[in-house]
């Protein structure tokens, strides 16, 4: 009896003090930020969580134990002028997905060539569970596959489960009947009753599987060859114990799934009241409201093509009836007094301020969710990845418009922004969706942490019922 009691005490202690590693893509501030609400909930419950990321050379560790690999004398493979130019000139289609994986492989080449000791340290360190980004974290896949403690790994998706991952994991999702990950900006619609949408969905699903399972796999296999003789991305995904996704089905819609796919993303951030200079700025009694302009961590305003930048600047300068808060990291600006530009803006706090009437953004999932939570109508101008689909989710529910960067002129952008600002249906729909989004029996982060803890109770894997 006493022995059984001691075993139970040790078992509970191990669950509540687990060593967990979160391994994100290189310079992956955005992806890590998507994972952090769940990670912080796990920290609150007593778990020790470390963060691995290849940083060029610096990046925040988000308050986690530091396993950051700071790489000097190299530029971030994801921050090339070529990639930044691509974002403004081209659409991100299914074949574009391979290039970020190639960048992740290039980063891993550097790690294994110049930082092999650090890689080996990660191989040999004991963790109870390893959480790896589903995208671009090539070296993390390598040291997880080699981990001496044989820690089980979980796939962490910062968006909806990619169709290749869903197929490799056999999650039971019919991606032909789901909105396409790389929805074209010239057709921001999803009508599965029409043959055209089912055909294009089928093509994208097959293409994504081929690209991830064969083309990308060969590039990653080449990078990891010095340490993993025959790496298989298919096998790595297949053998994961579960998948966690930040995409709420409240936005993308319900879908069938297996019991090892968990979502935790239908949460809202906690805002703080505006203070100081920013509060004084938005409190102008003559203002019709605040417009927030923020395009995430990837867009460098100093490298935006001149004509497109001028179109945005001219549009913002013309909206003199509003106070405009712009998260801006480019060259010095010549703006009118109604524009407040700063390299850092408390985005959540501005969105939740009751004076904010419009959000102009790129349509990253965090931005779409923050617009949803704060009941803020939006104009989304997608730049890359799945951002067209993210914008579609808000457009489909009636509180946003999706604007194409290919028709970016001051006249076109101003017309779209005025439409959302002056049509009250956008704000009414935003308020309605926010109420539905927050109406949960169990808080999604509490539920997500429960499922993560259940994995730990069973040695990092799903319980076996049969």
What does each model-identified segment do?
Residues 27, 32, 37-322, 333-337, ...:
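Nucleotide-sugar-dependent glycosyltransferase catalytic domains
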Residues 408-425:
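C-terminal "capping" alpha-helix adjacent to the active site of nucleotide-linked donor transferases
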Residues 14-28:
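Nucleotide-activated donor-dependent transferases that construct or modify glycoconjugates
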Residues 71-76, 157, 265-266, 362-363, ...:
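Short beta->alpha connector loops at strand-helix junctions that form conserved
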Residues 1-17:
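Cleavable N-terminal signal peptides of Sec/SRP-targeted secreted and luminal proteins
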Residues 130-132, 343-390:
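A donor-sugar binding/catalytic signature common to diverse glycosyltransferases
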Residues 339-340, 378, 396-405:
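A short acidic/histidine/glycine-rich donor-binding loop in glycosyltransferase catalytic cores
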């Amino acid at each position: 009896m006493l022995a059984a009691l001691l075993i139970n005490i040790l078992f509970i202690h191990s669950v509540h003090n687990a060593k967990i590693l979160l391994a994100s893509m290189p310079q992956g501030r955005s992806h890590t930020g998507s994972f952090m609400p769940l990670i912080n909930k796990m920290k609150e419950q007593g778990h020790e969580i470390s963060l691995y990321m290849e940083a060029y050379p610096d990046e925040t560790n988000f308050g986690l134990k530091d396993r950051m690999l700071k790489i000097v004398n190299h530029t971030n493979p994801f921050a090339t002028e070529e990639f930044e130019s691509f974002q403004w000139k081209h659409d991100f289609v299914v074949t574009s997905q391979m290039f970020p994986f190639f960048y992740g492989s290039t980063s891993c080449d550097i790690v294994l060539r110049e930082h092999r000791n650090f890689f080996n340290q990660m191989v040999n360190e004991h963790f109870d569970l390893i959480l790896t980004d589903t995208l671009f974290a090539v070296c993390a896949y390598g040291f997880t596959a080699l981990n001496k403690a044989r820690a089980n790994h979980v796939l962490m998706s910062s968006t909806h489960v990619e169709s290749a991952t869903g197929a490799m994991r056999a999650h039971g999702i019919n991606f032909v009947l789901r909105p396409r990950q790389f929805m074209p900006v010239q057709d921001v619609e999803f009508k599965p009753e029409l043959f055209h949408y089912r055909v294009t969905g089928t093509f994208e699903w097959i293409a994504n599987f081929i690209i991830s399972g064969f083309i990308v796999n060969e590039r990653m296999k080449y990078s990891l060859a010095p340490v993993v003789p025959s790496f298989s991305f298919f096998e790595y995904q297949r053998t994961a114990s579960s998948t966690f996704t930040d995409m709420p089905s409240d936005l993308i819609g319900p879908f069938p799934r297996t019991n090892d796919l968990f979502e935790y993303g239908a949460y809202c951030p906690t805002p703080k009241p505006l203070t100081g200079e920013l509060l004084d700025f938005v409190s102008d009694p003559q203002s019709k409201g605040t417009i927030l302009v923020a395009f995430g961590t990837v867009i460098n305003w100093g490298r935006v093509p001149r004509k497109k930048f001028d179109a945005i600047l001219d549009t913002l300068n013309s909206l003199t009836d509003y106070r405009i808060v712009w998260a801006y990291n480019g060259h010095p600006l010549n703006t009118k007094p109604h524009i407040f530009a700063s390299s850092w803006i408390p985005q959540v706090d501005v969105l939740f301020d009751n004076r904010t009437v419009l959000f102009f953004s790129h349509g990253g999932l965090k931005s779409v969710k923050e617009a949803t939570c704060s009941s803020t109508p939006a104009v989304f101008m997608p730049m890359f990845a799945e951002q067209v689909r993210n914008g579609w989710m808000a457009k489909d529910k009636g509180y946003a418009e999706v604007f194409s960067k290919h028709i970016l002129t001051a006249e076109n952008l101003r017309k779209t922004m005025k439409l959302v600002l002056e049509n009250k249906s956008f704000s009414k729909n935003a308020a309605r969706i926010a109420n539905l989004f927050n109406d949960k029996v169990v808080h999604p982060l509490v539920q997500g942490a429960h499922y993560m803890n259940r994995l730990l109770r069973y040695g990092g894997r799903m319980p076996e019922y049969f």
